[in-house]
């Protein structure tokens, strides 16, 4: 599946938010790249809404067409469209692997999933966009447990807090999905209502 593979720091600087997590290059220069990066740009309502959508897309590594499908699905569901959209994005398997601390970044998590290192309820899944459900059980495959990414993940367990809707169990790094997250459990620097306003036009 197509995806953005360019420099993440450049995107972070353009959008004004760390899309990677712990990006030291962004922390040093948190303004847009280029000769006029520090210059003030007049913000229009449309620009602000578009920028918020781009932040969400690049945070979760989703292309425009798929992001629009997620929005349309969220809009059909009961409740707040913005909350529904974030819940859909958070339930992607690559994001769950990242949230559980088994990968340093979502991009790394996407790669681990694509390479077939995980099973969901006993079935191998290698599709990063696969959507988990409440009570799903995600396991690292036996042959993958002693590879470098998972050894490092065990050694650094606890460095990053795991959200309460997930639980990681034991040396096997089993992930239990207790529920799908509520908005208060999703710590992303997004104003999802701006995305809703953009697509509602």
Swiss-Prot record:
A Gene Ontology cellular-component term:
small ribosomal subunit
Q: Where is this region: Disordered?
A: 1-38
Pfam family name, one: S4
Q: Which biological process annotations from GO are given for this protein?
A: ribosomal small subunit biogenesis; translation
**Entry keyword set:** Ribonucleoprotein, Ribosomal protein, RNA-binding, rRNA-binding
All copies of the S4 RNA-binding domain together span: 91-157
Disulphide bonds annotated for this chain are none
Entry's family note: Belongs to the universal ribosomal protein uS4 family.
Function, as annotated: One of the primary rRNA binding proteins, it binds directly to 16S rRNA where it nucleates assembly of the body of the 30S subunit.
Quaternary structure per UniProt?
Part of the 30S ribosomal subunit. Contacts protein S5. The interaction surface between S4 and S5 is involved in control of translational fidelity.
Protein name as it appears in the record? Small ribosomal subunit protein uS4
Name the lineage.
Answer: Bacteria, Bacillati, Actinomycetota, Actinomycetes, Mycobacteriales
Gene transcribed to yield this protein? rpsD
